[in-house]
């Protein structure tokens, strides 16, 4: 069912792509376990860098790791020192040459993983869970490519004795529709009362004919002051003429 299954796994090859790009026969289990270790190491080491996604691509000689982050400065470090340290650690972990690509996520409020992480960080800092959830929903719905969002928090919310689940949503989130582009992210908040799980679904439109609505609805570059066609407004010309008459 659409509500139970992972949205990314359900839409693999339809609207979403694999996060590991390689082929293996007898070494499949070894590569898979290695990918898991690489991702766990990066998430643990760069917990404050806002890691949105990690894509791994393998060839015979080397491993390429693409890190999608909201704060690339933390990952790179001063004069690339942190990136060099990460590369050395990953080469020891994989036993191959590692090419590290650090990519910035510009639209943070439209990324489900970063939204979930933001809510979890607020819960850790003792912000009221309803306030954190509503703030995340309002920030996401301001983005032009976001058509709907659903947020779920589970655990001892507000320090209650009994754990419960709270859900908030706005707009459309069609989890059964395969052509729907659903971004999904999870994160855990470590509080004094225990762990609180955060899940976020963001609907960004449909994918029709290989074209994504989110790319079509992406915010365009801001024009200068003028009319819709980019021409200067007439008021400015009138002001210039009146000033010229006064000077004459």
UniProtKB/Swiss-Prot annotation:
SMART domains: KH (SM00322). One of its GO terms (biological process) is translation. The keyword rRNA-binding applies. Keywords: Ribonucleoprotein, Ribosomal protein, RNA-binding, rRNA-binding. Transmembrane segments: none annotated. Residues 38-106 form the KH type-2 domain. One of its GO terms (molecular function) is rRNA binding. The keyword Kinase does not apply. GO terms for cellular component: cytosolic small ribosomal subunit. Residues 213-248 are annotated as: Disordered. Residues 213-230 have a biased composition (Basic and acidic residues). PANTHER family: 30S/40S RIBOSOMAL PROTEIN S3 (PTHR11760), SMALL RIBOSOMAL SUBUNIT PROTEIN US3C (PTHR11760:SF19). Part of the 30S ribosomal subunit. Forms a tight complex with proteins S10 and S14. This is Small ribosomal subunit protein uS3. It comes from Corynebacterium diphtheriae (strain ATCC 700971 / NCTC 13129 / Biotype gravis). The gene is rpsC.
């Amino acid at each position: 069912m659409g509500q139970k299954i992972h949205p990314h796994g359900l839409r693999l090859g339809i609207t979403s792509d694999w996060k590991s790009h390689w082929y293996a026969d007898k070494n499949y289990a070894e590569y898979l376990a290695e990918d898991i270790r690489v991702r766990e190491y990066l998430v643990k080491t760069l917990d404050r860098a806002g890691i949105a996604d990690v894509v791994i691509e393998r060839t015979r000689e080397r491993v390429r790791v693409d890190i999608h982050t909201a704060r690339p400065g933390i990952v790179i470090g001063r004069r690339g020192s942190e990136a060099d340290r990460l590369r050395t650690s990953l080469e020891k972990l994989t036993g191959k040459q590692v090419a590290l690509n650090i990519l910035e996520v510009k639209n943070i409020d439209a990324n489900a993983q970063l939204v979930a992480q933001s809510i979890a960080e607020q819960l850790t800092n003792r912000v009221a869970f309803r306030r954190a959830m509503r703030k995340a929903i309002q920030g996401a719905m301001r983005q032009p490519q976001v058509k709907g969002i659903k947020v779920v928090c589970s655990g001892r919310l507000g320090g209650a004795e009994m754990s419960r689940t709270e859900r908030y949503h706005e707009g459309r989130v069609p989890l059964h529709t395969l052509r729907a582009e659903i971004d999904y992210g999870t994160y855990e908040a470590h509080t004094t009362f225990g762990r609180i799980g955060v899940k976020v679904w963001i609907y960004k439109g449909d994918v029709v004919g290989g074209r994504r609505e989110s790319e079509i609805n992406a915010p365009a570059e801001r024009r200068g002051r003028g009319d819709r066609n980019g021409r200067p407004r007439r008021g400015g010309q009138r002001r210039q003429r009146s000033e010229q008459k006064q000077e004459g």
